[in-house]
């Protein structure tokens, strides 16, 4: 589920969505549609959903949400990746490194630690230790590796328009139109910024 009914930002706090299962069904509708439409990847949220997960862990670390609901119930076969594990919703309440291991255990394929390389290195060591201790399943991590490689393969094969399309006359005209429409006149003075798209 997404941030639709949250009042806190997971960058700085741990949001909780207390909705009933019926209310949550409304928030899950876009995800059902996206999965049915063949979306290739879904990012998890660092939000507590007590109606869906009884163990007081956010969706990113919830096997009930990631594996049981997203994979099994919705049938999602694509890539599941976490939001940054250094966000306060994880870092302050569970710890970035422990959270990374828990996210992989929940069924997340790709864990994002995007600010501090040292935390990424610690997470790699923690994952290796969790594998050795049997906390993480080698089969699950192999499946995640397969999911990552499949996503890369699909993206590599995808037909992309040439970059020259970006600088085509239609795009330049749209850029100029948006440029002019996005300015707000604060004082009635002649337009002085010109047509340079950098302004």
Residue spans for each PLM region:
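Second-shell residues forming the walls of enzyme active-site clefts
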Residues: 1-139
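Preference for extracellular/luminal or secreted protein segments
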Residues: 72, 94-199
